[in-house]
Amino acid sequence: MNIPETKLPRIVVIGGGFGGVAFIKNMQKEAVQIVLFDRHNYHTFQPLLYQVSSASLEPDSIAYPLRKIFRKSKGFHFRMAMVNRVDSEAKKVYSSIGELDYDYLVIATGTRTNFFGNENVQKYSMPMKTVPQALNIRSLILQNIEEADICADLNERKKYLTFVIAGGGPTGVEMAGALAEFRKSILHHDYPFISESEMEVHLIEGGDRLLSAMSKT
């Protein structure tokens, strides 16, 4: 793994998301060695993933190289790897590139998509937590529109142009708005044979209102 031995306390951080990055920034003035593990070598600004999915932004606009973020941080080391196991008694992490001892461990691996027990949503939908997932969604959206552009069967055409978003939280609302903006401002320019009214965007929420985590006022 090629991490230098040190007499300083070694802190291993698993996850280069908001929590992991914020923790490391707060520790930059401390006399410690920090080793960050993440499966990607970039930090993703997740609030803007929907703009990548809707083709409003390119991935490099929301992906920041982790090595660059901490380039001036002394005692910082990054390893792109998956951490498979933690032995808390032996104070050791086991990763896809080897094992490493630690003095302190920070687990900042983020969250997983919650399907709330809905098996159909889990089976047929595409989650949007990472840049690759956002690009997959973008690719499918544009592919469907291309298929609709050459489809003569109206029923099949309608299937290609119907988009369903599960979840009325901030990301779902923003994604629905981005697709609506695409339909209004871009669709007729790039696809003149598809009318705005043909493209449907459905936002599905299990609760009684959208943005339920936010104040009504």
List each language-model region with its residue ranges:
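Acidic, glycine-rich loop-and-beta core segments that form the ion-binding/anion-interacting portion
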Residues: 217
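Beta1-alpha1 glycine-rich phosphate/pyrophosphate-binding loop at the start
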Residues: 2-77, 84, 163-164, 170-214
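FAD-binding core/adjacent interface of flavoenzyme oxidoreductases
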Residues: 1-10, 76-166
